[in-house]
Every structure is written in structure tokens, then in C-alpha cells.
UniProtKB/Swiss-Prot annotation:
Alphabetical keyword list: Coiled coil, DNA-binding, Transcription, Transcription regulation
Coiled coil feature spans: 2-27
HAMAP family recorded: GreA_GreB (MF_00105)
Task performed by this protein: Necessary for efficient RNA polymerase transcription elongation past template-encoded arresting sites. The arresting sites in DNA have the property of trapping a certain fraction of elongating RNA polymerases that pass through, resulting in locked ternary complexes. Cleavage of the nascent transcript by cleavage factors such as GreA or GreB allows the resumption of elongation from the new 3'terminus. GreA releases sequences of 2 to 3 nucleotides.
Protein name: Transcription elongation factor GreA
PANTHER family, A to Z: TRANSCRIPTION ELONGATION FACTOR GREA
GO biological process, alphabetically ordered: DNA-templated transcription elongation; regulation of DNA-templated transcription elongation
InterPro entries assigned to the protein according to its UniProt record, in alphabetical order: GreA/GreB_C_sf, TF_GreA/GreB_CS, Tscrpt_elong_fac_GreA, Tscrpt_elong_fac_GreA/B, Tscrpt_elong_fac_GreA/B_C, Tscrpt_elong_fac_GreA/B_fam, Tscrpt_elong_fac_GreA/B_N, Tscrpt_elong_fac_GreA/B_N_sf
Family: Belongs to the GreA/GreB family.
SUPFAM superfamilies given in the database record: FKBP-like, GreA transcript cleavage protein, N-terminal domain
Length: 156
């Protein structure tokens, strides 16, 4: 059985848009660059040709990866999950015990994780600890060095 890729509807839509861009924009662009580089003649010392071929290989690999993720996407359905329970697709806000600054993250599938925009993978150490917990729960979150104790203050 193939691995499934749990994700939000938004994440699936982003992957579909990326795939369309790769196939309709990026692939034709790199093919044109290869044609131009070939027109320069000798390919043995043609760095533009080599760079374009490398980019083409990357694009084709990414197309294959994205197609697989779309094919085996598993859209999360939180209808049966309690409103105050942390789950994939939900936003969770917590505060370190003894502190006042809140931190908020959306827990998403690995394919759509982007910590810089507040989206953490459901497979990350912090998400694994938080999933299934509820507002008011106090948990120990692993850090690269040690851990911190946090209280879940909001889930939506």
C-alpha cells in the first residue's frame, strides 16, 4: 500500500497550483532554454546547456513528487474531532508555563509545512505531543536541547 499524505484542502489546492505551474510554465521555459543552448553548437563545454538540463531534471522530479502527493492525498476531516482538541488542520495557541507570550501554529501535513508562516508538520516533535490534547492541557514540548512545559490556551 502506498503512503498517504494527510493534508488540508488548502494544502491540496496549493499542490495542484504548483503542478499546473510546473507543467505549463516551468517545463516549457526550460525546454526553450535547452533549445537555445543547443543552438550554440558544441555541447561538451556548454555550461548553459548543462544548467538547463540540470534544471529540467529537477522540474521533472518535482512534477513526479507532486503528482504522487496529489494522488495519495488524504484530506483531513475534523467534523468528528472535538472543537477544543488539537488535530491536523487546526490552529493551536499555547503559552509556556510561567510566561505570557503566546505562540500559535497550524498543524498541517508534511507536504504543506512551512514553519516561517506558522504551519508545522503533523510529524514534527511538537505537533506529535500536541495532537489529541485539549484546551487547558499542560504538556512537555521537546526542544533541540531539553523541553518546555506549555499550556494549550486555544484551538480553532
Amino acid at each position: 500500500m502506498e503512503k498517504t499524505f494527510p493534508m488540508t484542502k488548502e494544502g491540496l489546492d496549493k499542490l495542484k497550483a504548483e503542478l499546473e505551474n510546473l507543467k505549463l510554465v516551468k517545463r516549457p521555459e526550460v525546454i526553450d532554454r535547452i533549445k537555445v543552448a543547443r543552438s550554440y553548437g558544441d555541447l561538451s563545454e556548454n555550461s548553459e546547456y548543462e544548467a538547463a538540463k540540470d534544471e529540467q531534471a529537477f522540474i521533472e522530479g518535482r512534477i513526479s513528487t507532486v503528482e504522487t502527493m496529489i494522488r495519495y492525498a488524504e484530506i483531513v476531516n475534523n467534523a468528528k474531532i472535538a472543537k477544543d482538541e488539537v488535530a491536523l488542520g487546526k490552529n493551536v495557541t499555547f503559552v509556556e508555563v510561567g510566561e505570557t507570550d503566546e505562540e500559535s501554529y497550524q498543524i498541517v501535513g508534511t507536504a504543506e509545512a512551512d514553519p516561517f508562516t506558522g504551519k508545522i508538520s503533523n510529524e514534527s516533535p511538537i505537533a506529535r505531543v500536541l495532537i489529541g490534547k485539549k484546551v487547558g492541557d499542560i504538556v512537555n514540548v521537546p526542544l533541540p536541547v531539553g523541553e518546555m512545559t506549555v499550556k494549550i490556551v486555544k484551538v480553532d
